Amino acid sequence: MGQRQGKPYRVALLGLYHESNTFIARKTTFEDFQNSHLLRGEEIIAEYRDAYHEIGGMLAVMDREGVEVLPLLFAEATPGGTVTAAAYQRLLNEMTTLLAETLPIDGCLVVPHGAGVSEEQRDMDGHWLGKVRELVGPDVPIVGTIDPHANVSRAMVEATDALIAYRTNPHVDQRDTGRIAGELMIKCLNGTIKPNQCLAKPPVTISIEQQYTAAYPCTLLYEEAAVLMQWPGVLSVSVVLGFPYADVPEMGTSFLVVTDDDRQAGVAVAQRLEALLITHRYAFVGKLETVDAQLAEMYRLEKPILWLDMGDNVGGGSLGDSVVLLKALERDGRLRGFTCIFDPVAVTVLRKYERGAQVKILFGNDYSLGLSHNPYAAEVSVLDKVDGKFRETTPRHGGQVQYDMGETVLVETAAGNVVMIHSLRVPPFSLSQLTSFGLDPAGFDVLIAKGVNAPIAAYGTVCHTIMQANTPGVTQADMTTMEFRVRPKPLFPFEDIST
């Protein structure tokens, strides 16, 4: 049992979770956290105890061991632009105040993303984890999880005893990863292990479309990591793929190894994985296909087709307002498609009309004309007006249960394509986004999802074909076309590292 001197261990639980795309002009505000998940105290337990989320896994272990969990704050916003200084400082102040009021504690479970950037702190996660360490002192174990899209910093590692990355992308093992972190925390509290973390950062970053963990080339790394996990004294081996849309000094792929006080083993394991990635680095550069080439191929493929809009990847920070793929279907006219478009202004206009009304409307943005605002003009029929709330109760990317698109209007274009226009940004991680509002995914030829790999966990259950489209936008697949200022150099594929 999790006890010391006959009393339950006291373990704090807190997290600040954001994947920040520094190429997006629109900043992430405090309101964005409020519109996503800003939970305090028992709200955290109620939301995640039974969820397929890392917090759910942590709680399961703590409950089993009789640990007193002290839930403080969990703040998460949909991936987007850099977090404003005001939003970060407000969240940090609340978090540290709550933690200070809770001391003394025996341990601290933390839930960072690992790719958070604020206006004043490029290494946002390293900064807030460091503040947690300052408060609790050097002897209180800090154990947590990170997203494999983290850009891991030395500061993150130095502030914690153990960080464990999810092993899957799409992320369907978050609850299990939280369980692993919870088990390590119990062992730390009982004094049966003394974690030592080793970080390796090879001069390589992996293209986003090559980060699908169930397929080659990612399987090269994960299969080797599984073998290395069997080494004596190794507690965890994390393959951290990295997030290529954050211009930070820590950008890139990394390997994080946790051992039981065996620094030599940790270094050896990390170096094995580093050498493997460098040797096979060219396999991690994707082959990109144009929209027109994919559209021409669709007629002979089994339907429905999942068409992934990589340039407007909401899970990577994009707005989710691109009409590039919708316009391609509209021009062609032979395939019936579905897509979601974020456009609160269009929603406000459409909400004034009754079901069945024919409306000429401007919505979305045509990124093929550049990054400035170029809305799409169409005549549509209003199908339905809904509140945009839905739930997901199965293991899906992100592990969330409650979703809220805000006020939402379903329309159908003259070409027969159905568009869900919504007022809050929500990534396409759940088929309930369709089924909750009476839409049958199997009734479409093409389902457009604004993502790269993450939507596959949900849409792959109904789509027989998956295609990643090389579309324009702030999450365009070819990161070498983007202007970086502070990323590390040399870094493959930007620079040659053969010498």
What residues fall within each predicted segment?
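Conserved anion/nucleotide-ligand pocket segment
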Residues: 178, 182-226
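Generic secondary-structure signature for well-ordered alpha-helical cores
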Residues: 63-67, 97-104, 134-137, 165-168, ...
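Short acidic, glycine/serine/threonine-rich loops at helix termini
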Residues: 23-27, 81-84, 120-122, 153-158, ...
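N-terminal amphipathic/basic leader segments beginning at the initiator methionine
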Residues: 2-64
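Low-complexity, highly charged intrinsically disordered N-terminal segments
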Residues: 59-87, 91-98
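Hard-cation-handling environments
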Residues: 9-11, 209-416, 420, 424
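Extended hydrophobic packing segments that form well-structured cores
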Residues: 71, 278, 390-499
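Active-site histidine-anchored catalytic micro-motif
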Residues: 12-19, 23, 33-34, 85-92, ...
